Each structure stands twice: as structure tokens, then as C-alpha cells.
């Protein structure tokens, strides 16, 4: 409310819920391009004259934007990053980049459950192992949804461990 002269900028998370990543049960939820557009448009027009929007694709609790909203295969990673950036920068609001977005970082590709550090991922894996899920099935969920995807260090170069360290963990 502009008359109250308080907050004039918001971080809205409706877009972050579109695919079910943080729904609590880790089940992917399908969405369509028109649904994505509706959410984005609602915040563009909904704040008209009364506030200012924050524009972002993710943060430390969500998978990497290119892996989540684009295609992170070598063939399409760069195009996906440019598409997401163009969409974000073409909107009204202040863009926020999570560290690594500016160089197109994608989800980490771990090969074992034990490589995940996040407590939410560990609890999910333990629960599903107790239910008899295969490691392959559990890994498919972790590779897509784990918060570890956005919690790896900034990649400095193409060397082993991204030039960040010679130590095996955290990368």
C-alpha cells in the first residue's frame, strides 16, 4: 500500500512453486508455458503503480535455473541460459542473480547418494531407502531437486573441481 510508505518491493515465490520442487514430497509437477506466462504476467501488472518486483530464477534453496527451467545438455545449455536471461532482463523489476547464474552454472552431477551434503537430501534418501527405493530412483530425484545443486562453489575454470579446490568435497 503506497499510502503507508513502507515496503515497495517484493520477492514473490509463486514461480518457484510451479514445478513442485519445494512441495515437500519431491514429486515433479508438470506445468505449461501458458501457466508460466500467467504467473510472470500477474506480477508484472499486479504491482503496477503500487510497487516494484524482484526478478529471479532461483536461490540457495532451488536447483540451478538452466537445469530447472531450460535444458542443461551441452547442446542447449548456453541457449537456455541466454533465453532465461533475456526473459528476466526484459521484464519490469530489479533482476537478482544467484551466484553462478551469470556464467550458466547447472546442477551438480553427483553419482552417489553419499555425495549429497544437504540434510533435506539426506533425510529424503534415508526415507526412500527404508521404503525400498533403488539408489537409481533416489538419485533421479536428488539430481533434479536437491538444494546441493545451488550450493556448490563458484566455478573458476574448467579444471577438476572447477579450479576452486584440490579437495574432493564440496564439489
Q: Which residues are covered by each model-predicted region?
A:
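Active-site and adjacent substrate-binding regions of carbohydrate-active enzymes
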Residues: 1-171
Amino acid at each position: 500500500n503506497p499510502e503507508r510508505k513502507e515496503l515497495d518491493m517484493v520477492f514473490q515465490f509463486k514461480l518457484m512453486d510451479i514445478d513442485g520442487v519445494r512441495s515437500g514430497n519431491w514429486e515433479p509437477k508438470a506445468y505449461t508455458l501458458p501457466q508460466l506466462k500467467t504467473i510472470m504476467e500477474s506480477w508484472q501488472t499486479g504491482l503496477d503503480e503500487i510497487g516494484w518486483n524482484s526478478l529471479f530464477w532461483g536461490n540457495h534453496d532451488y536447483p540451478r535455473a538452466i537445469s530447472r527451467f531450460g535444458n542443461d545438455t551441452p547442446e542447449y545449455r548456453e541457449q537456455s541460459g541466454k533465453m532465461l536471461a533475456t526473459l528476466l532482463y526484459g521484464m519490469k523489476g530489479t533482476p537478482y542473480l544467484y551466484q553462478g547464474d551469470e556464467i550458466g552454472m547447472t546442477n551438480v552431477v553427483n553419482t552417489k547418494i553419499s555425495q549429497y551434503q544437504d540434510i533435506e537430501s539426506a533425510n529424503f534418501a534415508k526415507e526412500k531407502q527404508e521404503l525400498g527405493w533403488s539408489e537409481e530412483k533416489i538419485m533421479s530425484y536428488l539430481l533434479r531437486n536437491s538444494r546441493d545443486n545451488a550450493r556448490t562453489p563458484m566455478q573458476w575454470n574448467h579444471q577438476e573441481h572447477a579450479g576452486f579446490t584440490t579437495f574432493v568435497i564440496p564439489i
